[in-house]
């Protein structure tokens, strides 16, 4: 399957930038923050509320309308565990709030290498616990490394009646051993070396790559997991692990042809990203 023409144009433009592997942590974070422009103009929402959970964990809540009964989507940004913040995914969280008619809680979880595993996973569970304490319907979502945290939080809260989980090209297998790691190692946006770097920075030396707290794909029991929708990109290093996890959840992942890792956060320039946003909203709306 050839690349989507808009995706191909994006990749051609990216050749003007330094390769990701040449960037230090600070530059990596700034690059993702600047990439928020690819989402398009941030839409207005009824309210934006900055929060601090448990005295340290920054979060931001988006309200589509002023209604305390609105369901709440806890969203974890991507960035390979080493980048991303409240600003990098601000437009996407606003769009999800409006499209799915729900409040969105964006979580500014701690990043590696300053804070290594299980810091981010602990932050994710804390954020979901806070959300569940609000007495409203709660779901979890995330892209890439954020989908890892969403999946892990869903596993940790089996008995909490989470409405659903939305996993966008999840980074959930630290073994980095699926065929898509070879097939799309280079030339398709973030590649195999970039993903492996994220895992190296995140996992302390000696961590078992199959530890389900780090790699939810290897969780022993998924039978009580909340309903899931897994989105994958055809030309993505992470494609195969996401689709394998979907099969374990008893569903088929929705693969978007001709797309690459990160496409979901580019609705400002990619028609297929706008389609995926609409599909994600439809899934969420069906579970409120």
Predicted feature locations:
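Catalytic nucleophile-loop/oxyanion-hole region of alpha/beta-hydrolase
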Residues: 85-86, 92, 100, 105-137, ...
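Hydrolase active-site cap/lid region
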Residues: 155, 159-207
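Short beta-strand element of the alpha/beta-hydrolase
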Residues: 69-79
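Short beta-strand-to-loop junctions in surface cap/lid or active-site-entrance loops
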Residues: 59-69, 217-222
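Gly/Ala-rich beta-loop-alpha elbow adjacent to hydrolase catalytic centers
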Residues: 142, 146, 150
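A glycine/proline-hinged amphipathic helix-loop "lid/cap" segment
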Residues: 1-64, 288
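Serine-hydrolase catalytic core
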Residues: 206-259
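Catalytic active-site module of serine/aspartate enzymes centered on a nucleophile-bearing elbow/loop
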Residues: 268-288
């Amino acid at each position: 399957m050839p690349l989507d023409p808009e995706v191909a144009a994006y990749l051609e433009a990216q050749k003007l930038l330094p390769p990701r592997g040449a960037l230090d942590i600070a530059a990596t974070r700034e690059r993702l923050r600047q990439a928020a422009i690819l989402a398009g103009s941030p839409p207005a929402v009824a309210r934006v509320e900055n929060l601090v959970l448990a005295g340290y964990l920054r979060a931001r809540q988006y309200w589509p309308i002023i209604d305390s009964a609105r369901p709440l989507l806890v969203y974890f940004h991507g960035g390979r565990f080493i980048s991303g913040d409240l600003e990098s995914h601000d437009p996407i969280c606003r769009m999800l709030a409006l499209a799915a008619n729900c409040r969105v809680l964006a979580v500014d979880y701690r990043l590696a290498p300053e804070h290594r595993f299980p810091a981010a996973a602990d932050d994710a569970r804390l954020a979901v616990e806070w959300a569940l304490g609000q007495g409203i319907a709660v779901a979890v979502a995330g892209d890439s490394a954020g989908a890892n945290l969403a999946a892990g939080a869903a596993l940790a809260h089996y008995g909490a009646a989470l409405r659903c989980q939305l996993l966008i090209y999840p980074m959930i297998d630290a073994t980095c051993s699926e065929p898509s790691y070879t097939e799309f190692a280079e030339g398709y946006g973030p590649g195999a070396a970039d993903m492996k770097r994220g895992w190296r920075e995140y996992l302390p030396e000696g961590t078992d790559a199959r530890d389900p707290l780090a790699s939810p794909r290897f969780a022993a029991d998924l039978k009580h997991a909340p309903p899931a929708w897994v989105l994958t990109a055809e030309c993505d290093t992470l494609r195969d692990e996401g689709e394998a996890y979907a099969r374990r959840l008893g569903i088929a992942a929705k693969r978007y042809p001709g797309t690459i890792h990160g496409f979901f956060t580019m609705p400002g320039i990619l028609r297929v990203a706008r389609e995926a946003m609409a599909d994600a909203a439809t899934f969420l709306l069906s579970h409120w």
